[in-house]
Regions:
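Basic, glycine/lysine-rich polyanion-binding surfaces/domains
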Residues: 1-188
Length: 188
């Protein structure tokens, strides 16, 4: 029998937190992710089923919405990432698909992405060095696709001016971490 051990996207046994000045960069591994896409002609039944499952309305373009358990992040027309605690939603795709039925297409995404949380009073200064988004004007709940160091990413404002999440393909975890820390050190 194989003796396998789960590793974080950065290749360690536990998530990593690094600090530079007033900024912390934390690898987030306790969230499950599924992509959710409304099926053609199913917008109304999807809206009803989604509200029942998530407890929140799917957000409009450029936004995320957070409820007691779930966070929905707009990723494209009629598409969202659904996040929930990994401890209770390890099988997030099955949970989501069973609740939404034929109103949506659902795909497991947890192991395909890395999430880093950037927190601190100078988070905006750091993010301005990384991506072309107007991060200084982003309000809590704003979400947008962007490019960071040539890597496609999703940037979410969790708390205006001081807490952002960056979600990028897992295969870029090391490169993204390096870019984030270089920017954090540049303002430390």
């Amino acid at each position: 029998m194989h003796d396998l051990a789960a590793l974080t996207p950065l290749g360690a046994a536990a998530p990593r937190t690094d600090r530079a000045g007033e900024i912390s960069v934390t690898e987030v591994t306790d969230r499950a992710i599924a992509s959710v896409s409304t099926r053609n002609g199913k917008a109304k039944p999807f809206a009803t089923a989604a509200k029942a499952l998530f407890g929140i309305e799917p957000p409009a373009p450029g936004l995320s919405a957070t409820g007691p358990v779930w966070t929905l992040i707009w990723t494209g027309p009629d598409q969202w990432f659904a996040e929930a605690p990994f401890a209770t939603h390890e099988d997030i795709a099955t949970i989501t698909k069973q609740a939404l039925g034929d109103t949506a297409s659902v795909t497991e995404q947890t192991d395909g992405w890395v999430r880093f949380d950037i927190e601190g009073p100078t988070a905006v200064d750091m993010m301005e060095r990384l991506c072309p988004l107007p991060v200084r004007r982003m309000k809590t709940g704003a979400a947008s696709r962007s490019i960071i160091e040539h890597m496609g990413s999703l940037v979410i404002c969790r708390a205006e001016g001081r807490h952002f999440s960056v979600i990028a393909p897992r295969s870029f975890a090391g490169s993204m971490h390096h870019a984030l820390m270089a920017a954090a050190r540049s303002i430390a």
